[in-house]
């Protein structure tokens, strides 16, 4: 039985994680805590799942690593600098693993994988991500990671910049740019989590889209992370790809 704690247990994602942990046959909920609660309640957990806020997650990780507790993190806002800081924390505390996933939806992970595979074959690639208006960061971690994967695949294939004759624009009209890939973030009431990758070349386009209709859709990926994090070969793992054999 894997003993699990949940940070952000009263949030939309955290409350789903609590239900999933309680329902699974091989996991036991030690404690679910939220803002203002004592983190010491999760001492004794094998793994803690963090769905909190970009402003809180680094301090949470520091505390978990210091106390020898594996972490599965769905909180967004991780750039290269933050990942490097997590690696430094882990170097100081052998025996602890951290899994950070931009998206725990297995279909979303497959969408990112397919996008990276398609990228070398198209001149143009842009990403549109759509989320609920309470999301704190933009672009989403999923869109950022997808852009990184597409950018790397394009670079490996020797592709240059995507064609774009824009010389005059309102600030932000062409979106943000991540590794040469334009990313557009929409925040719409009624949405949960959606992403579309649009590829184009002469005479044809390809669209790869993923839609999460509810937060329950992320739970198989979260539980996979909980079950696998302690045995992962790398101290820090980013994304579910290796857990899925991709």
Swiss-Prot record:
Principal location listed in the UniProt entry: cytoplasm
InterPro entries per record: DapB_C, DapB_N, DapB_N_CS, DHDPR_bac, NAD(P)-bd_dom_sf
Domain of life: Bacteria
Catalytic reaction(s) noted: (S)-2,3,4,5-tetrahydrodipicolinate + NAD(+) + H2O = (2S,4S)-4-hydroxy-2,3,4,5-tetrahydrodipicolinate + NADH + H(+); (S)-2,3,4,5-tetrahydrodipicolinate + NADP(+) + H2O = (2S,4S)-4-hydroxy-2,3,4,5-tetrahydrodipicolinate + NADPH + H(+)
PROSITE patterns noted in UniProt: DAPB
Gene3D superfamilies: Dihydrodipicolinate Reductase, domain 2, NAD(P)-binding Rossmann-like Domain
Binding site for (S)-2,3,4,5-tetrahydrodipicolinate: 132, 141-142
A GO BP annotation: lysine biosynthetic process via diaminopimelate
Record carries keyword Amino-acid biosynthesis: yes
Keyword entries, A-Z: Amino-acid biosynthesis, Cytoplasm, Diaminopimelate biosynthesis, Lysine biosynthesis, NAD, NADP, Oxidoreductase
Subcellular compartments: Cytoplasm
GO MF annotation terms: 4-hydroxy-tetrahydrodipicolinate reductase; NAD binding; NADP binding; oxidoreductase activity, acting on CH or CH2 groups, NAD or NADP as acceptor
Biochemical pathway: Amino-acid biosynthesis; L-lysine biosynthesis via DAP pathway; (S)-tetrahydrodipicolinate from L-aspartate: step 4/4
Positions of the catalytic residues: 131, 135
Residues bound to NAD(+): 8-13, 34, 74-76, 101-104
Protein's UniProt keywords contain Oxidoreductase: yes
GO cellular component assignments: cytosol
Catalytic activity, EC: 1.17.1.8
UniProt xrefs under PANTHER family: 4-HYDROXY-TETRAHYDRODIPICOLINATE REDUCTASE 1, CHLOROPLASTIC-RELATED, DIHYDRODIPICOLINATE REDUCTASE
Family: Belongs to the DapB family.
Function text: Catalyzes the conversion of 4-hydroxy-tetrahydrodipicolinate (HTPA) to tetrahydrodipicolinate.
Protein name in UniProt: 4-hydroxy-tetrahydrodipicolinate reductase
